Regions:
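N-terminal targeting sequences that direct proteins away from the cytosol to non-cytosolic compartments
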Residues: 1-109, 113-151
Protein backbone atom coordinates (compact mmCIF):
# COMPACT_ATOMS: atom_id res chain seq x y z
CA UNK A 1 0.00 0.00 0.00
CA UNK A 2 1.04 3.59 -0.58
CA UNK A 3 2.41 5.79 2.12
CA UNK A 4 -0.13 8.05 3.84
CA UNK A 5 1.14 11.32 5.19
CA UNK A 6 -0.92 13.76 7.22
CA UNK A 7 0.01 17.35 6.55
CA UNK A 8 -0.83 19.90 9.21
CA UNK A 9 -1.93 23.28 7.86
CA UNK A 10 -1.69 26.86 8.95
CA UNK A 11 -3.82 29.83 7.94
CA UNK A 12 -2.36 33.10 6.72
CA UNK A 13 -4.68 36.03 7.35
CA UNK A 14 -3.63 39.59 6.67
CA UNK A 15 -3.59 42.39 4.11
CA UNK A 16 -7.19 41.59 3.18
CA UNK A 17 -6.66 37.94 2.23
CA UNK A 18 -6.73 34.51 3.81
CA UNK A 19 -5.39 31.17 2.61
CA UNK A 20 -4.33 27.80 3.98
CA UNK A 21 -0.81 26.45 3.52
CA UNK A 22 1.15 23.43 4.80
CA UNK A 23 2.56 24.14 8.26
CA UNK A 24 6.06 23.08 7.22
CA UNK A 25 6.19 25.72 4.46
CA UNK A 26 8.30 28.84 4.76
CA UNK A 27 6.33 32.07 4.65
CA UNK A 28 7.56 35.66 4.38
CA UNK A 29 5.50 38.84 4.30
CA UNK A 30 6.85 42.05 2.83
CA UNK A 31 5.28 45.41 2.18
CA UNK A 32 3.23 48.11 3.79
CA UNK A 33 -0.45 48.89 4.25
CA UNK A 34 -0.86 49.88 0.56
CA UNK A 35 0.94 46.94 -1.10
CA UNK A 36 2.08 43.66 0.34
CA UNK A 37 3.55 40.41 -0.92
CA UNK A 38 3.28 37.04 0.80
CA UNK A 39 5.92 34.53 -0.33
CA UNK A 40 5.08 30.89 0.46
CA UNK A 41 7.73 28.22 -0.23
CA UNK A 42 7.03 24.50 -0.19
CA UNK A 43 9.28 22.67 2.27
CA UNK A 44 9.95 19.65 0.04
CA UNK A 45 11.09 21.28 -3.16
CA UNK A 46 11.16 24.11 -5.59
CA UNK A 47 7.48 25.11 -5.54
CA UNK A 48 6.62 28.61 -4.39
CA UNK A 49 3.79 31.11 -4.59
CA UNK A 50 3.64 34.88 -4.39
CA UNK A 51 0.39 36.54 -3.37
CA UNK A 52 0.36 40.31 -3.77
CA UNK A 53 -2.35 42.70 -2.65
CA UNK A 54 -2.51 46.30 -3.84
CA UNK A 55 -5.00 48.84 -2.49
CA UNK A 56 -4.39 51.16 -5.48
CA UNK A 57 -6.31 48.51 -7.49
CA UNK A 58 -4.18 48.23 -10.66
CA UNK A 59 -5.84 46.65 -13.70
CA UNK A 60 -5.55 42.83 -13.60
CA UNK A 61 -4.87 42.75 -17.37
CA UNK A 62 -1.80 44.94 -16.82
CA UNK A 63 -0.60 42.87 -13.86
CA UNK A 64 -0.86 39.58 -15.78
CA UNK A 65 0.77 41.09 -18.86
CA UNK A 66 3.66 42.53 -16.81
CA UNK A 67 4.31 39.07 -15.35
CA UNK A 68 4.14 37.51 -18.82
CA UNK A 69 6.57 40.09 -20.26
CA UNK A 70 9.08 39.25 -17.52
CA UNK A 71 8.70 35.50 -18.11
CA UNK A 72 9.01 35.92 -21.91
CA UNK A 73 12.24 37.90 -21.45
CA UNK A 74 13.75 35.12 -19.33
CA UNK A 75 12.25 32.17 -21.24
CA UNK A 76 11.54 33.13 -24.88
CA UNK A 77 10.49 29.58 -25.80
CA UNK A 78 7.81 29.32 -23.14
CA UNK A 79 4.37 27.92 -23.83
CA UNK A 80 1.37 29.81 -22.46
CA UNK A 81 -2.38 29.42 -22.42
CA UNK A 82 -5.11 31.67 -21.03
CA UNK A 83 -6.43 30.47 -17.68
CA UNK A 84 -9.31 32.67 -16.63
CA UNK A 85 -11.38 31.28 -13.77
CA UNK A 86 -13.64 32.13 -10.85
CA UNK A 87 -11.37 32.61 -7.84
CA UNK A 88 -12.17 33.80 -4.32
CA UNK A 89 -15.63 34.82 -5.52
CA UNK A 90 -14.26 36.90 -8.39
CA UNK A 91 -13.55 36.56 -12.10
CA UNK A 92 -9.78 36.14 -12.29
CA UNK A 93 -7.65 36.65 -15.36
CA UNK A 94 -4.58 34.54 -15.81
CA UNK A 95 -2.20 32.36 -17.75
CA UNK A 96 -0.69 28.94 -17.33
CA UNK A 97 2.91 28.82 -18.53
CA UNK A 98 5.45 26.04 -19.13
CA UNK A 99 9.14 26.56 -19.81
CA UNK A 100 12.42 24.67 -19.64
CA UNK A 101 15.12 25.75 -17.22
CA UNK A 102 18.07 23.73 -15.94
CA UNK A 103 16.84 20.68 -17.91
CA UNK A 104 13.50 20.71 -16.07
CA UNK A 105 9.97 21.56 -17.11
CA UNK A 106 8.68 24.36 -14.92
CA UNK A 107 5.05 25.41 -14.70
CA UNK A 108 3.74 28.79 -13.58
CA UNK A 109 0.13 29.67 -12.78
CA UNK A 110 -0.72 33.36 -12.82
CA UNK A 111 -4.08 34.68 -11.62
CA UNK A 112 -5.27 38.20 -10.85
CA UNK A 113 -8.57 39.80 -9.86
CA UNK A 114 -9.75 43.21 -8.70
CA UNK A 115 -12.41 43.98 -6.12
CA UNK A 116 -13.78 47.30 -4.88
CA UNK A 117 -11.05 47.19 -2.16
CA UNK A 118 -7.90 45.82 -3.81
CA UNK A 119 -6.24 43.92 -6.62
CA UNK A 120 -5.01 40.43 -5.73
CA UNK A 121 -2.23 38.90 -7.85
CA UNK A 122 -1.18 35.25 -7.49
CA UNK A 123 1.79 33.54 -9.10
CA UNK A 124 2.67 29.94 -8.29
CA UNK A 125 5.54 27.96 -9.79
CA UNK A 126 6.72 24.35 -9.57
CA UNK A 127 9.03 21.91 -11.34
CA UNK A 128 8.36 18.51 -12.87
CA UNK A 129 10.96 17.10 -10.46
CA UNK A 130 8.42 17.50 -7.68
CA UNK A 131 5.84 15.28 -9.34
CA UNK A 132 2.33 16.04 -8.16
CA UNK A 133 3.50 17.62 -4.88
CA UNK A 134 4.34 20.98 -6.44
CA UNK A 135 1.16 21.21 -8.48
CA UNK A 136 -0.94 20.11 -5.49
CA UNK A 137 0.75 22.71 -3.28
CA UNK A 138 -0.11 25.52 -5.72
CA UNK A 139 -3.65 24.24 -6.35
CA UNK A 140 -4.41 24.04 -2.63
CA UNK A 141 -3.20 27.60 -2.07
CA UNK A 142 -5.35 28.87 -4.95
CA UNK A 143 -8.43 26.93 -3.84
CA UNK A 144 -8.20 28.26 -0.29
CA UNK A 145 -7.55 31.91 -1.26
CA UNK A 146 -10.21 34.30 0.03
CA UNK A 147 -10.55 38.05 0.08
CA UNK A 148 -11.63 39.45 3.44
CA UNK A 149 -14.25 42.18 3.52
CA UNK A 150 -13.12 43.83 6.73
CA UNK A 151 -9.59 44.86 5.73
Amino acid sequence: MGEFRTVRSEVYEGHGIRFTYPADSQIEVDGDSERSTVDVRHSDGLAFALVRTDLSRPDPDLMVEAAMVALREDYPDLSESPANEFLAGNDALGSDVEFFSLDMVNTTSIRCFRTPRRTVFFMGQWSDLEGDDGAGFIESLLESLEELDDE
